[in-house]
Amino acid sequence: MKLKQSVEKEVRKHAEEEHAIGRECCGIIVKDKYIRCENISEEENSFEISVNDYAKYMKNDTLQAIVHSHNNDFHLSKEDMVGQIKTSIPWGIVNVVSGTVRGMHFWGDSLPVKDLIGREFIHGSQDCYGLVRDYYKKEKDIKLKQYPRDNYWWSNGGDLLSEENFKETGFYKIDSSELEVGDVILFSIRANVVNHSAIYIGNGEVLHHLSKRLSRREPIHIWNKYIVCFLKYKGE
């Protein structure tokens, strides 16, 4: 989502002002204008927009996006993901580091799919499962289920990328000999559960996105020892 320069300037100013007093900023974009909202959350590193502020613009179908700031990262929290899904409009995160905005990231299924190769890793949006979802949306016009999650969920007892969850999303297990372009491969990389997914793109290569790296295509044999299973989409 591309903001007008004047709108982006207002968002940046608000985020930096709130960061200076240890708060997250929050606001809404309406008719290409940024409107500041009061953060009524009592918790640090959290935000909440009052029901009245939200409803005033939502009822007229003029609300384009909800924006809030994070201190020192872009990564989506589980609450961010739940909130965006519930509102069905794009959300944006403003990353403030040492008092200065370092960038903005918008996400949501209504936005165009970004390039699949060379994207920055942002947990909850541009991560391994986000890449699988975007591949299926772009290449097959299929909308896969979203799973709200916290960062490093696998180290806290989570099992997001389980075979059961993929089955619920419309996949079934196949043998490696049946592997075709577009099939999904699940991995367990230095974890007790499946914590990575990739798409097979043919010629012995996968498309995937690891933490702290850009999304890329790589030979599958590099990751052979981490493979747990192969999955094919059949529809929900």
Feature map (PLM): residue ranges:
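Conserved beta-strand-loop surface patch within small alpha/beta domains used
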Residues: 1-63, 71-109
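Generic beta-sheet signal
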Residues: 92-94, 209, 233
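Second-shell loop/turn segments in exported
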Residues: 116-122
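Active-site nucleophilic cysteine motif
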Residues: 122-139
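Short acidic alpha-helical/loop segments enriched in Asp/Glu that coordinate divalent cations
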Residues: 141-153
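...with weaker cross-activation on analogous glycine-rich loops/strands in unrelated enzymes
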Residues: 150-216, 220-221
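Glycine- and charge-enriched low-complexity intrinsically disordered segments
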Residues: 218-236
